[in-house]
Amino acid sequence: MIKRLFCFFLIFFFLISNSFAKENFILNWDKLIPLNAYDFVPETGITFEMWDDKNFVKKLNKAGLKFNKKIIGKSIKLYGFMVPLEMDYHEDLIVNEFILVPSAGMCIHVPPPPPNQMVMIKLDKPIKARYMYQPISVEGILKNTPPIKDTFDSIYEISTNKIIDIDNDQFIKHFEESQK
């Protein structure tokens, strides 16, 4: 009887822990930034004069390269927007990899977000590119990678094919909940 009870609890706890392990942690973009990374920035925000201060800009760039060690290796779900790096125009705009960014329209033509606010997505299989303003969710294991010089500076990476289109209402709801 005791042996059966022990086996029951062992299996029960294994199943519970295994189900938690498979569940993706929904991550907000601010969690990609470690605490105190930008503690030198005044609460009132950055002024135009601060952009002329080379030491301040150097600190700002250095802070953008800091990553949150607590979330590396975790199975996550992250909402954002696709910025394709290369597309095969002969194959209905197929992509093999892209950058996931927190806001629509962030691309090469505007100043990019800091490296700790971009996630390199490497696809297991090519997929069709999404429209620039189409919110998506990406699921996978978050890794830390060194930035690639002279291209983009993402310091996070996910290899996956779990890309899901999200409707605007769902994206707005997630954004509003993340601000609470």
Identify what each model region corresponds to.
Residues C7-I16:
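Bacterial N-terminal signal peptides
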